[in-house]
């Protein structure tokens, strides 16, 4: 089970976008990376093809999972733990102890 999943609201802990928050669009568990909406935006030069025009495209690049933390109910970054509730393994916020709904 992953600590950060698609749809989670996260805050960036390190790097050029430190302190910014966003929603996780994609998680790549094999690379330990995630793509966050509106964070770590890069510009790529697109060559013209038969279907696409040439130009500069902005898109989100991936961030390492160690640089992300889930945002708790009160808006502060929290670490994630696991607990078994009613026979199911669930994610729990370390700061408040609340179950993180997935």
Curated annotation (Swiss-Prot):
CDD domains (alphabetical): KOW_RPL26
SUPFAM superfamilies (alphabetical): Translation proteins SH3-like domain (SSF50104)
Family matches, as InterPro entries: KOW, Rib_uL2_dom2, Ribosomal_uL24, Ribosomal_uL24_CS, Ribosomal_uL24_KOW, Translation_prot_SH3-like_sf
Keyword set, alphabetical order: Ribonucleoprotein, Ribosomal protein, RNA-binding, rRNA-binding
Any one Gene Ontology BP term: translation
Superkingdom of this protein's organism: Bacteria
PROSITE patterns: RIBOSOMAL_L24 (PS01108)
Pfam families on file: KOW, ribosomal_L24
Family note: Belongs to the universal ribosomal protein uL24 family.
HAMAP family listed in its UniProt record: Ribosomal_uL24_B (MF_01326_B)
Quaternary structure, from the entry: Part of the 50S ribosomal subunit.
Protein name as it appears in the record: Large ribosomal subunit protein uL24
